[in-house]
């Protein structure tokens, strides 16, 4: 979904907000500090010391890049995509203090409008009154294959497909069953199943929807 959101923002001249990267950045910081990600009090104590920023990586017209992700002035753009972070991000994201802090930051980006935001609770909780909501979905197997390609493109270690499928399925389970802002489709969102669609097909489809509002 980040690839699609990034290209849509580029095509429409809007700001791209990768909310998932913010949760990954905090997860990376928690792990880097040796804090137990399952300890909400310890994680909450770290929140004031974790300054997360997203900046543009340039103006590549053909291939818009993901935002550069910074934690306390250190670039963590690649570090937040590792399997270690992926395995813990749902645990961190389910914590009330974490969601309250990061949702406030995300909503500040949206005050003026004109953004494309992606994230697992973006349409239901972060921006419930958005003009256009898309619920992108694909099978676990397809998402695992895409994750392998993404990691390889970033020259990061690429786990076995079965390992990624397990990680993704477990993350879905955690995110769908959490008490705070669970993963679900907003009632006014349009579902787009992407298994048999290229990224370009999905981008064109959503851009056409945007032009109709």
Task: Name each model-derived stretch.
Residues 77-153:
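ATP-dependent NMP and nucleoside kinases share a basic, alpha-helical "lid"
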Residues 16, 133-135, 189-192:
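Conserved beta-strand scaffold positions in the cores of enzyme catalytic domains, especially
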Residues 7:
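Active-site signature of alpha/beta-hydrolase-fold catalytic machinery across serine-
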Residues 11-80:
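N-terminal phosphate/diphosphate-binding loop that engages ATP/GTP or pyrophosphate donors
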Residues 121-122, 128, 134-135, 139-145, ...:
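Anionic, Ser/Thr-rich low-complexity intrinsically disordered regions
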Residues 2:
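Walker A/P-loop
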Residues 68-77, 86, 145-154, 173-213:
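NTP-dependent small-molecule kinase module
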